[in-house]
């Protein structure tokens, strides 16, 4: 294993961290950890109009929630602008770049002419070969790109990538307002941070070819690149703006566990044999770029629900309880007392097995914490109405059981006797208990629920059902 691998994640704080960015961060982190290397975080905050402190915090918090820790201090790209400008001027001195005095109007007119002819536009600057400067005239610094040959690199996912230099223009390095462009800033920062490997989406392939021209001009060794296929929707189409707008913080608010998201993202484009459920410790041990596929990954909400259910089931009941209490309290509008929390804790083991997410679990658990009258759905209301005469008998028989005898065996035999005495199917008696105690038919074992809620609370609910007109 290499001990000098350094990867990075370099988000722009113009939006929240989304699935694609989170996967990029995860893959870079895993590759670094697999190789006993370092994973660095750089915030590319040079777009001051769209960047904000709130979005920077949102990205950092999302990474922390996903348990993707970075090494060292966060690098803010905006702090390095003077260094970027210095490099642009160095390229001028070395005749690897030149001043371009063409106006925006001239360039736009040129673009229109190329567009009308259906030709690929590449700015052919008249200033490229002039060796003098003009003071007090608006100018930019452009890279002196080669006009012949090819730019190629060995992509660790796709193999050899070759781009004709005729397709690569003399890119702007420094704007007329003396601000560096993205392409220059990224190259300088990656070099200064000693980045050895960059894993990013295939939408950066053209950027990589252009950045390699800058590396060549500076005579710097470029990092190794691995471009990962983009994420598509369930139908195999490019993600719509609606899908792209779903941030990691929103998945958190929906009640998805970070372990589930990480496992889900890991399997989006990367595989290890036929394993679906993979812990992060296993992922660090197994991660290899050669196991990243070339086909776009697809969103699969069913798989995410499956993984989330798995990790919720593995998590200790007390931990899950503390996660869902705020959701429940927000819904009901008051704080739960210790008795209600006790009911919840007892019932969580069974409820966890059935849930998709924490919000769903909180909603499914509400019957444990509701006061009489509890919420009763339409199906349960119909059963209460149809079996009105049963509830007084249920109440009388169940109230005769002592508190110490309120257990599975006694409750089961009592319900069986009621069924036989009334000549009603035992399943219908259980329906009556579900309707009155839970308020719905879809719930775990009613006997277990009755034991968890205890006798007094169950009798209150049965009594209420008995008196419903």
Curated annotation (Swiss-Prot):
Keywords: Aminoacyl-tRNA synthetase, ATP-binding, Cytoplasm, Ligase, Nucleotide-binding, Protein biosynthesis. Gene3D superfamilies: 1.10.10.350, HUPs. A motif ('HIGH' region) lies at residues 11-21. InterPro entries: aa-tRNA-synth_I_cd-bd (IPR045462), aa-tRNA-synth_I_codon-bd_sub2 (IPR020751), aa-tRNA-synth_I_CS (IPR001412), aa_tRNA-synth_I_cd-bd_sf (IPR008925), Glu-tRNA-ligase_bac/mito (IPR004527), Glu/Gln-tRNA-synth (IPR000924), Glu/Gln-tRNA-synth_Ib_cat-dom (IPR020058), GluQ/Sye (IPR049940). The keyword Transit peptide does not apply. HAMAP family: Glu_tRNA_synth_type1. Catalyzes the attachment of glutamate to tRNA(Glu) in a two-step reaction: glutamate is first activated by ATP to form Glu-AMP and then transferred to the acceptor end of tRNA(Glu). This is Glutamate--tRNA ligase 2. The lineage of its organism: Bacteria, Pseudomonadati, Pseudomonadota, Alphaproteobacteria, Rickettsiales.
């Amino acid at each position: 294993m290499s001990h000098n691998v350094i990867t990075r994640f370099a988000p722009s704080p113009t939006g929240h961290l989304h699935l694609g960015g989170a996967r990029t961060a995860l893959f870079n982190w895993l590759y670094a950890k697999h190789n006993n290397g370092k994973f660095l975080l750089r915030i590319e905050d040079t777009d001051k109009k769209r960047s904000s402190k709130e979005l920077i915090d949102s990205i950092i918090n999302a990474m922390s929630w996903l348990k993707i820790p970075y090494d060292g201090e966060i690098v803010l790209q905006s702090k390095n602008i003077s260094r970027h400008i210095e490099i642009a001027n160095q390229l001028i001195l070395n005749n690897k770049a030149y001043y371009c005095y063409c106006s925006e109007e001239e360039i736009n007119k040129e673009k229109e002419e190329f567009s009308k002819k259906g030709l690929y536009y590449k700015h052919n600057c008249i200033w490229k070969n002039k060796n003098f400067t003009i003071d007090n005239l608006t100018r930019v610094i452009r890279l002196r790109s080669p006009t012949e040959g090819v730019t190629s690199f060995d992509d660790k996912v796709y193999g050899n990538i070759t781009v004709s230099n005729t397709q690569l223009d003399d890119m702007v390095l420094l704007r007329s307002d003396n601000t560096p462009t993205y392409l220059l800033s990224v190259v300088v920062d990656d070099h200064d941070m000693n980045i050895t490997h960059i894993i990013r989406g295939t939408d950066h392939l053209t950027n990589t070819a252009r950045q390699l021209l800058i590396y060549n001009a500076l005579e710097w060794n470029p990092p190794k690149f691995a471009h990962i296929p983009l994420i598509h929707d369930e139908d195999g189409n490019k993600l719509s703006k609606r899908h792209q707008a779903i941030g990691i913080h929103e998945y958190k608010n929906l009640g998805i566990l970070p372990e589930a998201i990480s496992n889900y993202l890991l399997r989006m484009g990367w595989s290890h044999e036929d394993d679906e459920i993979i812990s992060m410790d296993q992922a660090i041990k197994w991660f290899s770029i050669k196991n990243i596929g070339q086909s776009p990954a697809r969103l699969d909400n069913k798989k995410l629900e499956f993984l989330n259910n798995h990790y919720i089931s593995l998590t200790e009941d007390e931990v899950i309880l503390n996660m869902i209490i705020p959701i429940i309290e927000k819904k009901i509008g008051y704080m739960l007392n210790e008795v209600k929390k006790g009911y919840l804790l007892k019932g969580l083991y069974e409820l966890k097995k059935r849930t998709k997410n924490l919000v769903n679990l909180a909603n499914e658990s509400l019957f444990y914490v509701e006061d009489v009258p509890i919420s009763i759905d339409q199906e349960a209301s119909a059963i209460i109405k149809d079996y009105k005469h049963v509830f007084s008998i249920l109440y009388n028989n169940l109230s005769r059981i002592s508190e110490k005898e309120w257990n599975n065996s006694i409750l089961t035999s009592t319900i069986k006797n009621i069924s036989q005495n009334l000549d009603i199917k035992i399943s219908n008696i259980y329906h009556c208990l579900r309707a009155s105690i839970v308020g719905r038919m879809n719930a775990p074992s009613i006997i277990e629920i009755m034991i968890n809620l205890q006798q007094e609370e169950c009798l209150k609910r049965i009594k209420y059902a008995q008196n419903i007109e």
